[in-house]
Amino acid sequence: MKRRTAECFSSETFHVSRFTSHESLVGRRGALSYEFERAGPRTILTCSSCTSPWHHFPPSYLDDSGCAYTWLVNPSGGLVGGDHVSVEAQLHAGTHVLMTSPSANRVYRSLSEPAVQEVHLSVGPAARLEWLPEVTIPFAGSRVRQSIHVDLAPGATAVVWDAIASGRVAMRERWAFAAVENEICIRTPLGGSVVERYCLVPGRLSESVGLVRSWDYVASLFVIGDAVDADVWKRLDVVLAAILEQRPGLVLGAVSTPAAPGLVVKFVARSAPDLTETLEAIWAAVREDLWNLPVPNLRRY
């Protein structure tokens, strides 16, 4: 896994390798690593490690599907400038893992260095990954750089969610962060990729925010995998589009078909409840159509 990480996060990905020696001494260096295997009907954790600020929790089993529900916990409450944290997970053949977080990912004000978070997830043959962290909240003056890279083996399916708030909305702090850079890259077995990149610098480049400025939440959901029939994708496309139309004026979005097998949902929302309710409806539809599984109530645990 160490070798894969070095290859995945090369100098062209947000130019991480260009950090100076001074910057390397600032902030925390935290790493969280998981390895999952199939044991009978269940997915089990076979290997793990973590360093501060990450805290390790073993997976839970909330239903009889065998899915390993795994929480990513940062007890420090967020990231500060100079922090460089990473998450790695290897899902072996036939496993099913859901990775989420118990609270929002807060990014605090920084004078110069960004907070960096790198995620690399490898999904084995016929494995299922659900990446559903809570929203990222960049505080005023914060700088954050995130990359999420997912590698899919034949028959693997990934559901990848990413959402960002305009700031501390309850404090009337909107689009006041210094910079947010984000990259999501999902690689398919045949060598294709689904990639989303953006850089938001509200103070210098108002056009980098554009029409999104009047909304408080921006979200993306990727559902990618070659194990799903084309008819299922078509049906799910219609269902997801209908969900986005249920909150006119509160949610605005669309469903698109990428070059890889799957769907991409992009939407903006007025409030946190609008964001959460839309995600839960979309997630429920995806689980039902792809795997005939209900959505667990993660908030109870």
Where are these regions (language model features)?
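N-terminal, charged/glycine-rich beta-strand/loop interface patches
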Residues: 8, 12, 19-136, 140, ...
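Broad gene-expression machinery/nucleic-acid interaction feature
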Residues: 29-33, 67-68, 84-86, 116-118, ...
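A short, polar/proline- and glycine-enriched secondary-structure boundary/capping micro-motif
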Residues: 54-58, 108-113, 141-143, 169-173, ...
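Short, contiguous, pocket-lining structural segments
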Residues: 81, 111-113, 140-142, 153, ...
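Short, structured patches in soluble enzyme cores that scaffold and shape functional sites
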Residues: 91-93, 101-103, 123-125, 133-135, ...
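Acidic (Asp/Glu-rich), glycine- and aromatic
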Residues: 139-147, 152-178
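A structural signal for small-residue-enriched, beta-sheet-centric alpha/beta enzyme cores
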Residues: 162-301
